[in-house]
From Swiss-Prot:
The twin CX3C motif contains 4 conserved Cys residues that form 2 disulfide bonds in the mitochondrial intermembrane space. However, during the transit of TIM8 from cytoplasm into mitochondrion, the Cys residues probably coordinate zinc, thereby preventing folding and allowing its transfer across mitochondrial outer membrane. It comes from Saccharomyces cerevisiae (strain ATCC 204508 / S288c). GO terms for cellular component: mitochondrial inner membrane; mitochondrial intermembrane space; mitochondrial intermembrane space protein transporter complex; mitochondrion. This is Mitochondrial import inner membrane translocase subunit TIM8. Mitochondrial intermembrane chaperone that participates in the import and insertion of some multi-pass transmembrane proteins into the mitochondrial inner membrane. Also required for the transfer of beta-barrel precursors from the TOM complex to the sorting and assembly machinery (SAM complex) of the outer membrane. Acts as a chaperone-like protein that protects the hydrophobic precursors from aggregation and guide them through the mitochondrial intermembrane space.
């Protein structure tokens, strides 16, 4: 992957600059979602998995993890929707 210098970016037309800015915003959003999911999974793993004795999780552990992460995601979606409605 090649890198762009400041002079390269300055020489771009406004449309290209906007496209790059939009792309970067999208990538930042994706990164934030991935970080949140990682954080939720980590919290839920600590909550749901008491010990690692096997290479597989028990059905109770799997269900707990799934429910836990889904509740975190549901909560975040409600918060985002609430924030958007207040704007």
């Amino acid at each position: 992957m090649s890198s762009l210098s400041t002079s390269d970016l300055a020489s771009l037309d406004d449309t290209s600059k906007k496209e790059i800015a939009t792309f970067l915003e999208g990538e930042n959003s994706k990164q934030k979602v991935q970080m949140s999911i990682h954080q939720f999974t980590n919290i839920c793993f600590k909550k749901c998995v008491e010990s690692v004795n096997d290479s597989n999780l028990s059905s109770q552990e799997e269900q707990c993890l799934s429910n836990c992460v889904n509740r975190f995601l549901d909560t975040n979606i409600r918060i985002v929707n609430g924030l958007q409605n207040t704007r």
